[in-house]
Amino acid sequence: MAFKDVFKGFFAYEDEEVYVEEQSDKVREPAQKKVVKETYVPEKKVVRTESFQKQSKPKMKVNEEKVTKANVVNMHDDIVNVSSKVCLFEPRVFSDTQDIADELKNRRATLVNLQRIDKISAKRIIDFLSGTVYAIGGDIQRIGQDIFLCTPDNVEVAGTITEMLEAPEEENE
């Protein structure tokens, strides 16, 4: 008879399966009324040998959430922490603009004074710096007459300068 019981566990009869479903439905109804959070999940281990099957005691397994640290490191973090400088430039020729662009690429804010250069070269410099600032995701702002502040993406400028600075410029032209 024990041999028959072993195979009974392997093969489910339809009559018994229907009976088990009816029984499990009755058991589930009261369980649906209660809300219980379990942190343990039972894990059954089945050991099979040549002539018989036996079940070991269910072990409790703890559900753990592992916190993994990201392996990606931002290369610009070191530069941001080291350099918090504002570079001042007063270009005399257009070729000085490349030095300003290099400082912007190194994530440093630059203040550009264009008072000692002719208007045509000043416009070319501002056009070049506008493209540089756009490429690095930064910003360019007019601070005063012929003075501009160029900032990379890691620098925020708070506040605005009033529009009164434009009035004297219009009168001079």
Swiss-Prot record:
Main location: cytoplasm
GO biological process: one example: division septum assembly
InterPro entries, per database record: Cell_div_SepF, Cell_div_SepF/SepF-rel, SepF-like_sf
Residues in coiled coil: none
Highest taxon of the lineage: Bacteria
GO cellular component: cytoplasm
Keyword annotations of the record: Cell cycle, Cell division, Cytoplasm, Septation
Key word RNA-binding present: no
Location relative to the cell: Cytoplasm
UniProt xrefs under Pfam families: SepF
Assembly mode: Homodimer. Interacts with FtsZ.
Known function: Cell division protein that is part of the divisome complex and is recruited early to the Z-ring. Probably stimulates Z-ring formation, perhaps through the cross-linking of FtsZ protofilaments. Its function overlaps with FtsA.
Family: Belongs to the SepF family.
Protein name from the UniProt record: Cell division protein SepF
Protein species of origin: Macrococcus caseolyticus (strain JCSC5402)
Gene that encodes the chain: sepF
